[in-house]
């Protein structure tokens, strides 16, 4: 008797986190997938990626410009707004939050 393993379908409804970064008193709203064991670790990991990109890549985005003024990533204030199941729902809710909060450092305002 031969058994064949069937591939299970990859989940498409993972948790996403809507977060806020405060850099030099200016705020940024973003969304990221929950990739680490906890929500906080996932958001801190995403903030570290923002910091790395600002230092290593030549992006002229407002967020990157403000992050370059910092000496260490620990100077970034991180807040979690919501955890939402599903990518589409999370991005829709992020737009709603951006409209309410009016963050200064968001340059990509698709949906606003």
Residue ranges and their predicted role:
Residues 33-87:
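Conserved short loop/helix modules at catalytic or binding sites
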